[in-house]
Regions:
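Non-catalytic accessory segments of DNA primases and related replication-initiation nucleases
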Residues: 1-155, 159, 208
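Phosphate-handling DNA/RNA-contact segment within nucleic-acid enzymes
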Residues: 75-97, 116, 137-246
Length: 246
């Protein structure tokens, strides 16, 4: 037929009652009554505000969201587009790095010390997965070997605070021998990391610096995860560290 059927993502069911109509551009669940279009779906399912849902849809199709006319010159418009594209590349790279850290928690030769620490703090594998928690071994360039293959990407890693420029123009990993906590913005994009050292090293916690996509004063660790768990979030309890949030 013209419509797609699936189990509803908004309530638990065994028989598909969720219908999507490409022609009419809306969805409807005959079980719970949820109804809307692509924008309202993102707002409900991903817990996004209206402007963020618009931005998310636009980025999916590699489109710029039109802004209020400000009489910009062609050069200014070009610069604005380049800045937008750069940030999209940044988000993609940070997401890949986050997946790499999560994989290292499963395959690194010294993974057990990280797993034992997390278990000792009462975290199950599912909780670690829900928060995207990962691990990076205590190596000089464990992450750089994977992602720093080109001069352009090496500079991008430095700009994003994932690498530090060393002597003889050789960047090295900022985070080494640490449990890694990805920091998400309100749209769920990875914008930075917090790393908890294993052992007696210092500092105990190492955080991403300010970058073009990460502004510490504007972000709250765990807010995205909290909104995913409860779309009618009424209040928050502010605690000190990453582990306390988890």
């Amino acid at each position: 037929g013209k419509n797609y059927q699936a189990c509803c993502p908004f309530h638990t069911e065994k028989s598909p009652s969720f219908s999507v109509s490409p022609d009419k551009q809306f969805y409807h669940c005959f079980g719970c009554g949820e109804h809307g279009n692509a924008i309202s779906f993102l707002m409900e399912f991903d817990r996004l505000e209206f402007p963020d849902a618009i931005e998310e849809l636009a980025s999916f199709y590699s489109m710029d969201v039109p802004r209020e006319q400000t009489h910009q010159t062609p050069a200014q418009l070009k610069q604005q587009h380049q800045a937008y594209q750069q940030k999209q590349n940044d988000y993609e790279l940070m997401a890949n790095i986050s997946r790499f850290f999560q994989q290292q928690l499963k395959v690194a030769s010294d993974k057990q010390v990280a797993i034992d620490y997390l278990k000792g703090r009462g975290l199950s594998g599912q909780i670690a997965k829900n928060f995207g928690i990962g691990y990076i071994s205590d190596q000089w360039d464990g992450m750089m070997k994977v992602f720093g293959q080109s001069a352009e990407t090496r500079q991008q890693l430095i700009d994003l605070g994932m690498a530090i420029q060393g002597e003889r123009n050789q960047p090295y990993d900022r985070f080494r021998g640490r449990i890694m906590f990805p920091i998400h913005d309100k749209r769920g994009r990875v914008i930075g990391f917090g790393g908890r050292v294993l052992g007696d090293g210092t500092p105990k916690y190492l955080n991403s610096p300010e970058t073009r996509i990460y502004h510490k004063g504007q972000e709250l660790y765990g807010l995205f995860e909290a909104k995913q768990a409860n779309k009618q979030l009424q209040q928050l309890v502010v605690v000190e560290g990453y582990m306390e949030v988890v």
